[in-house]
């Protein structure tokens, strides 16, 4: 009987990718099979996020919920950014944890588990062996028509509020050829859409063979687009400072590059952006968007926003609201500032009452939601090209797919359509999703 591993993932798409790789490593080395039920697991892993305090504390709450399973001999591990940040402190706070490992050492999981058994004590490895992780991962195994591919790790921007450079290290790019080989392997398995991942993905500079030359992100996109079977290319997350003219021009040269971009701005006040050490102004950010939309008028934009950064005044907040109106974002991830230990912003004086921050967050989200609904309503009556991803989460009798602009569409259809690119006419708009019906025959397809 095979051993079972339960993996709970917190945070970003990079963590989702890493969780898949944990399962692959454990399956290849020790025969583990994934399970969705922690009660059936022989090994429970938490792949953690430390971007906000709430996410970090939830990890320890969840650890408490599975502690009783130790009586059955279940092994428990903590990986990801909380593991990287806290290290041995996790063992002190939760001594029943067996292994602690960082994002860069997940490939060593089998070794850590073997050492735990041999030495009868918890094992911790939160080192930064740079790109070694990718050299020791088994070939990607996927189910479905879309897949993530990590092309780089870490971030070297050191924004004043962010823990990523401390938990994932500085920027390290995978070799150019390695990325192309992985994408080609996924295409051979039927993948039609790839999402290229990195904390600062557009800073990619990958080694090209034994030469001193480096491939930038725009060149990588061109080569990925040439791989047979790949029909759509997405990427996340990008930094405004790295959005070069070459990358903007890629949207004119590469039709497979989708008309959707997640480009975190974080704020709309130049004073706050400077305090955040973001390295650009609101005007420079909007200039990048204007250039992109000159090439792709239908470009859908999403962003991250931090409300209540230390020293944020009502005037600063209104500047952020103006930027939101000017850009007309299609989606956002918005949060109240959460001071992270060890970052410069954690030491800044903050005298804004929490109720003021909460009111601002609610006001911001209300405007974003209004924009999202308006954009959704504009799609009604158009025909959208979808990649059908699976059964609808809203209604098990329907299917769901995603438009080029990253909008989910639910529609009635046969399961044989899963994994296919199809045309769907939009019949109804909701704030975050659309409803539609499959188009039969030849119909002019709108991009969306």
UniProtKB/Swiss-Prot annotation:
Top-level taxon of origin: Bacteria
EC class (word): transferase
Domain Radical SAM core: 141-374
Record-level GO cellular component terms: cytosol
Keywords recorded for this protein, A-Z: 4Fe-4S, Cytoplasm, Iron, Iron-sulfur, Metal-binding, S-adenosyl-L-methionine, Transferase, tRNA processing
Family statement drawn from the similarity comment of this UniProt entry: Belongs to the methylthiotransferase family. MiaB subfamily.
NCBIfam families referenced in this protein's UniProt entry, alphabetically: miaB-methiolase, MiaB/RimO family radical SAM methylthiotransferase
Protein name as it appears in the record: tRNA-2-methylthio-N(6)-dimethylallyladenosine synthase
Organism: Acidovorax sp. (strain JS42)
